[in-house]
């Protein structure tokens, strides 16, 4: 039997009919804050408001619903960093199927609990592997041994067609409001979303520039399409943007992206954190890291989009509240507002007051101070964190720190030391 490896607009139209009474038609909203900030019209496609707070339900339900009754009776499996797993779990409960869902051990607890909530007694969750790719290998082995049906999170034409329904929905909504998009920004993990969206847009909105956005620490599609012209596996990835941190994209999604995507943007994980906080404080939107990628990319494209009409897909809103401290820290580091040093501190009365008076600026704040006094030595090691009001004050701060202790270590520039703090 020949395995289908291409996706057409007809496939997406058929998927749209299957999903019509299953998924929520999420809002397409003109965002006034972003529009003013970038001097253009910025629309947000709010898939963070989907039933499972992610677009992944579209692809999961479509891929499962096309299985034969015999195949469905054998049960389904999947590997996912969270959102695809929720889509599979939701579908398993809806269609009363047995599902075994494999998730990396690094998956935020919030996402694990949501999978269990949506799937209830129909779903068994297995936490395994440090990355999605390790988790995937375990899932495929289990699927083969138990003769079940693996629901691929991105490298499957039915999954891609389901994700593509988002594009059809967007274009129908924009047509009602007489809106034409000049640019579309969407996140790339394994490539299912960008493949489905771009397939539909290239036929029905061919003048729209499709921009794929990846975290800089996991830019597997860019490395495959632009750098190597073949699918490659990244040896190491930053797993912070867990919904888009994939070491290897799909063979099918690679071919579609290569044909349809106009440009790729890599966004620093710290910039993503700043966007998450900005979206929450300015727009009351709770976006997960992968969900904020598309908006983060606007800063890279600000000169191109001025005066244009832009749409950003907010792909998910499953953010674990326990990650907020790390998100704030990464944002402050990226914005050059928070700085850590290791100092040799004099062990004498008044040394701390001297440091505060001589080193800190009038608006600087100490956010961390760890010190263990050793009576047998003249100095003790101090780890100190200093938060600035303006990142332009950093040069003067470093000069004052160097004068206080010429042997100091600036932790921000040492990834290994910094990882011990965050």
UniProtKB/Swiss-Prot annotation:
Catalysed transformations (reactions): L-threonine = 2-oxobutanoate + NH4(+)
Taxonomic lineage of the native organism: Bacteria, Bacillati, Bacillota, Bacilli, Bacillales
Molecular functions (GO terms): L-serine ammonia-lyase activity; pyridoxal phosphate binding; threonine deaminase activity
Biological function: Catalyzes the anaerobic formation of alpha-ketobutyrate and ammonia from threonine in a two-step reaction. The first step involved a dehydration of threonine and a production of enamine intermediates (aminocrotonate), which tautomerizes to its imine form (iminobutyrate). Both intermediates are unstable and short-lived. The second step is the nonenzymatic hydrolysis of the enamine/imine intermediates to form 2-ketobutyrate and free ammonia. In the low water environment of the cell, the second step is accelerated by RidA.
Pathway: Amino-acid biosynthesis; L-isoleucine biosynthesis; 2-oxobutanoate from L-threonine: step 1/1
N6-(pyridoxal phosphate)lysine modification, residue list: 56
Family as reported in the entry's similarity comment: Belongs to the serine/threonine dehydratase family.
Pfam families: PALP, Thr_dehydrat_C
Residues the record lists as binding pyridoxal 5'-phosphate: 83, 189-193, 315
Cofactor(s) listed in the protein's UniProt record: pyridoxal 5'-phosphate
EC id: 4.3.1.19
Domain of life: Bacteria
ACT-like domain mapped to chain residues: 339-413
Any one biological process term the GO annotation gives: isoleucine biosynthetic process
Subunit structure: Homotetramer.
Xref: InterPro entries: ACT-like_dom_sf, IlvA, Ser/Thr_Dehydratase, Ser/Thr_deHydtase_PyrdxlP-BS, TD_ACT-like, TD_ACT-like_sf, TrpB-like_PALP, TrpB-like_PALP_sf
UniProt entry keywords in alphabetical sequence: Amino-acid biosynthesis, Branched-chain amino acid biosynthesis, Isoleucine biosynthesis, Lyase, Pyridoxal phosphate
Broadest EC class assigned to this enzyme: lyase
The protein's name in its UniProt record: L-threonine dehydratase biosynthetic IlvA
